[in-house]
């Protein structure tokens, strides 16, 4: 459930009229709901009851420090993939001891900084990385806590660009090689093995791929026991899907119950999850103004002031996201539109063949935009990044101001 609802045919974010936000802050505009973020995080956290667990919000999904601060206040951990994300977490008041560091290309500087602030663990993705971390930790006089990211070769049945658990993907160590890598890790003087990690993909709408991956990890854990290697945690990553249109992904409680049943023989093993989209997607919308309506022999176009520079998911993943009118009290003729943006690319669209009742100057909202929206935005076509607003009840807070045009070239120089 989210807190974007119609009241008297006008769209509200919690107790704030979205039209008022658009008029106050301008468009394009990302709007987030605090109550929705908190509800979704608690859905994961409460699902595990008294079982040792840690919910690590995936920073990549929605990296604004205003959002991260809400997560930190809830006691959330964080899944990061860069030093930039680490610094965001720290700036937002996050606890470094609840940070897990994923990613296939961790640099020397990133590893040093993570060791300096004492993150919870590195999710190691290759033998080379493991040796690199061991060397750097030794130079710093530290012991690096590590979890090996195991690639279980499980088909997540999702878009190929967000499938991460097949043997042809770049992520992690093959499940068939992981035992030997753990043995190697156990011999390195500056490494402490703390757990096992796995992430098979994103926007999964069924439980079976998760359970198949868990089965393979359990087999590996038993093998490690034979080798005298014990684990303190099992990190099953993120990936639980959300409802964009008519998808019916499992509820976090169903997911948790299935995992707890699988892991009932490991009561002391802490479970770590890394949800991102499942927390933030339906906690945000992207508000735009209809600049022009245009028709040709085959199509009607609603041309808006936002596009793939602000929301690239439709272009990159062929993602379907609902588009709705902000004010349904207005008398408008219904028509089928391709909703497009101002960017000079044919792939610049928010949605195709959508029935809308709109006129030029009206506001519309792209739903489920809280994940992989602002965090994947760009300045393509020299367009300034949009503002972001957080709604808390009947109050709104500007958590990112709109970029100025001068800031587009502030880091550049002529010769």
Swiss-Prot record:
Gene Ontology terms for molecular function: diaminopimelate decarboxylase activity; pyridoxal phosphate binding
Cofactor dependence: pyridoxal 5'-phosphate
UniProt keyword list: Amino-acid biosynthesis, Decarboxylase, Lyase, Lysine biosynthesis, Pyridoxal phosphate
Chain residues that bind substrate: 277, 313, 317, 345, 372
Signal peptide: none
UniProt GO BP: lysine biosynthetic process via diaminopimelate
Chain positions recorded as pyridoxal 5'-phosphate binding sites: 239, 274-277, 372
Domain of life: Bacteria
The enzyme's E.C. designation: 4.1.1.20
Entry-annotated residues carrying N6-(pyridoxal phosphate)lysine: 60
Family of this protein: Belongs to the Orn/Lys/Arg decarboxylase class-II family. LysA subfamily.
Subunit structure: Homodimer.
Name under which the protein is recorded: Diaminopimelate decarboxylase
């Amino acid at each position: 459930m989210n807190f974007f609802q119609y009241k008297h045919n006008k769209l509200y974010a919690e107790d704030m009229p979205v039209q008022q936000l658009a008029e106050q802050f301008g468009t394009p505009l990302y709007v987030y709901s605090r109550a929705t973020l908190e509800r979704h995080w608690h859905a994961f956290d409460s699902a595990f009851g008294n079982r040792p667990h840690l919910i690590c919000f995936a920073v990549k999904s929605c990296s604004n420090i205003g959002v991260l601060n809400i997560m930190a206040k809830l006691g959330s951990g964080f899944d990061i993939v860069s030093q930039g994300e680490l610094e965001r977490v720290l700036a937002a008041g996050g606890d470094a001891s609840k940070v897990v560091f994923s990613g296939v290309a961790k640099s020397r500087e990133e590893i040093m900084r993570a060791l300096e602030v004492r993150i919870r663990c590195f999710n190691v993705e290759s033998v080379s990385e493991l040796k690199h971390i061991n060397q750097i930790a030794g130079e710093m006089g530290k012991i690096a806590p590590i979890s090996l990211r195991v690639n279980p070769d499980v088909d997540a049945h999702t878009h190929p660009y967000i499938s991460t658990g097949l043997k042809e993907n770049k992520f992690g160590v093959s499940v068939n090689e992981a035992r030997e890598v753990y043995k190697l890790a156990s011999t390195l003087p500056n490494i402490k093995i703390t757990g096992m990690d796995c992430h098979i993909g994103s926007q999964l709408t069924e439980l079976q791929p998760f359970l198949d991956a868990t089965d393979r990890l359990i087999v590996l854990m038993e093998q490690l026991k034979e080798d005298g290697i014990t684990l303190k945690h099992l990190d099953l990553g993120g990936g639980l899907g959300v409802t964009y249109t008519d998808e019916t992904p499992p509820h976090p409680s169903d997911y948790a119950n299935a995992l707890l049943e699988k892991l009932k023989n490991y009561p002391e093993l802490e479970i770590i999850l890394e949800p991102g989209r499942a927390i933030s997607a339906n906690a945000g919308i992207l508000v735009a103004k209809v600049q022009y309506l245009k028709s040709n022999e085959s199509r009607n176009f609603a041309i808006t002031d936002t596009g793939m520079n602000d929301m690239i998911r439709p272009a990159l993943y062929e993602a379907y996201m609902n588009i709705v009118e902000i004010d349904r009290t207005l008398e408008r003729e219904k028509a089928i539109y391709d909703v497009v943006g101002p960017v000079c690319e044919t792939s610049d669209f928010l949605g195709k063949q959508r029935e809308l009742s709109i006129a030029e100057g009206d506001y519309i909202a792209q739903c489920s935009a809280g994940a992989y929206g602002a965090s994947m935005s760009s300045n393509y076509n020299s367009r300034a990044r949009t503002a972001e607003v957080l709604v808390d009840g009947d109050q709104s807070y500007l958590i990112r101001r709109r970029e100025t045009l001068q800031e587009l070239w502030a880091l550049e120089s002529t010769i």
